[in-house]
Amino acid sequence: TAKGVGNFFHRTWQQAVKGKNNLLPIFVAWFDIDIYSIPIDNHEEFIHSMDEYEWDLWKLGATLEAIAWYREKKKDMKDIWRMNSEYPSTPTEAFQSTGRRRFRLSDTLKLRETCIDPIFHGEISGSEETGVESLQNLRLSKEEIGCLSIWKMPDKSKRYRNRYIVVMDVGGVSDEADYTDITVFDRYWMMDGGIPEVVAEWHGHIDHDKGAWKAVQMATFYADEEDAMVVIESNTLETEGTEGNNFEYILDEIAGHYSNLYCRTPADQIRQGAPAKWGFHTNTSTKPMVISHQAKAIRDSLYIERCEEAVDEHDTFEIKEDGKTMGAVEGMHDDRLMTRAIGVWICYRIGLPFAVNTPIATPTRKVISEATI
């Protein structure tokens, strides 16, 4: 039985289903195997006793005798997820990897329905890799192995304040380290009661300073600074003993050139002289908060996902054995998931986008903090 999503076998299966490799996808459900059935004495009585999942099995093609066998076999299994994994009815059940998953399988299946191939794959660059010069002469270059994926290009036909949110989850530089992920959300449809959608993502390994400026590059590519907020997850940067030592200086430098940078220091405290603490701090309080909101968001379809790999990370995110902490299953990552959890949470906590009909003067420093949200 195949177990786990996001691994080689799962990726190969997905590519085969999409016709992107030379393999023919064939799935054999448990009810396609004749030995998995038992006789039924009273068919009418059995039909009236069937639950919702058993009716789903019937719709998938299982006979009543097969469903009767499944009902009896399930009594031998400690957890329903083990039954689904050992005797899968669908490919999704076959790839299920854990019974401690944080997000419901039915919800992630729904989230996966809006995933599509990007219209662009490559890289974004400016005159320099860091500093204010990195925001000048921005250009895209197509590359097969590039880190940037775009599902929707910027719409600059008209300005909309608060339209875009760019979220960065900081990773490491080495191949073994976590990835840095930068996700762009477009909130345009929220003006009319709609929902935000993922429109671009940069995913790879990069130095922290270059990665931070890369996030600002993407924000600048999509909108003027008053129209795109940059949110950098700062926990990694503040707790690491190596690569993150100088990141406070880097964020201060960015703030000097880009005004719409998320700050968790209350604005009134800054006015009184308190130092600005840039970035979203993920800790034992805020992580459960944004993860709980993300669970609600995918359950209630509160945002549009485009990236299959991001859904994979939802499928491999679990509650650990202590029953308190959460994270990716061993060998997997959650960087894409965290940009979604933070980004969607912020999408619903700042003011709605609105059209800007007249030219705007040079913006003054605007502090966006947890207090203002």
Listing of model-derived features with the role each one plays in the protein:
Residues 269-276:
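Surface-exposed intrinsically disordered loops and tails
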Residues 277-284:
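Amphipathic alpha-helical blocks and their helix-capping loop/short-beta junctions
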Residues 1-9, 18-22, 38-40, 44-266, ...:
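RNase H-like, metal-dependent nuclease domains and their acidic two-metal-ion catalytic environment used
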Residues 12:
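Active-site-adjacent substrate-recognition loops and nearby beta-strands
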Residues 26-32:
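Conserved AAA+ ATPase "SRH/arginine-finger" region at the nucleotide-binding site
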